[in-house]
UniProtKB/Swiss-Prot annotation:
Biological role stated in the UniProt entry: Integral membrane glycoprotein that plays an essential role in the immune response and serves multiple functions in responses against both external and internal offenses. In T-cells, functions primarily as a coreceptor for MHC class I molecule:peptide complex. The antigens presented by class I peptides are derived from cytosolic proteins while class II derived from extracellular proteins. Interacts simultaneously with the T-cell receptor (TCR) and the MHC class I proteins presented by antigen presenting cells (APCs). In turn, recruits the Src kinase LCK to the vicinity of the TCR-CD3 complex.
Cytoplasmic side: 192-210
Region annotation (Disordered) ranges: 139-161
Full protein name: T-cell surface glycoprotein CD8 beta chain
Source organism phylogeny: Eukaryota, Metazoa, Chordata, Craniata, Vertebrata
Annotated GO MF terms: coreceptor activity; MHC class I protein binding
Residue ranges, Extracellular side: 22-170
Tagged with keyword Lipoprotein: yes
Species: Felis catus (Cat)
Residues with attached carbohydrate: 102
Matches recorded under Gene3D superfamilies: Immunoglobulins (2.60.40.10)
The UniProt record lists the keyword Nucleotide-binding: no
Amino acid sequence: MQPGLWLLLATQLAALRGSSVLQQAPGSVMVQTNGMVIMSCEAKTSPTSTRIYWLRHRQAPSPDSHYECLAYWDPIKGIVYGQEVEPEKLTVFPDATRSILNLTSVKPADSGIYFCMTVGSPELTFGKGTRLSVVDVLPTNSQPTKKPTPRKKMCRPPSPVTQKGPSCGLLTLGLLVAGVLVLLVSLGVAIHLYRLKRRARLRLLKQFYK
């Protein structure tokens, strides 16, 4: 089997199960364009002289997957870069049993899954991978602004008009009193007329019988 194909198959298996020997962090990270990213890979059981390689995969694992060897740290040579890697954007340095990968001025094209790897004899050991997403605008967690619900206008009945003047009770009482007075006056007039007629009749009778 060709070494390139062997590395491809081994890395695909690493994407599925990873390794507890190499502890990689963070699991995923999202940054804005031109931002900076720091990843770490710690070898738990390997000696401090073990080389830790950094690989990148730009898309989800598939039969046509292409993995790039980015860089590794050599105690004598220092940072050893892979092909087509921009040294000004990528730095690797050791920290005891860890390897630190520092990416600067990242672009959306740098998005992908980053793996750390150690080479044994003959096995390859991989970290679980760090998924990097580079976006132009970071998503916000703020909730969308809700338009206030317009309040319904309540139709109020017109206020009763207060009429100034005497109350109904007083008005009715006044009418009754006026009616009684009219009746009394009418009765007095009728009695007076009756008396006048009676007197006139008596006078006529007296004149007739003389």
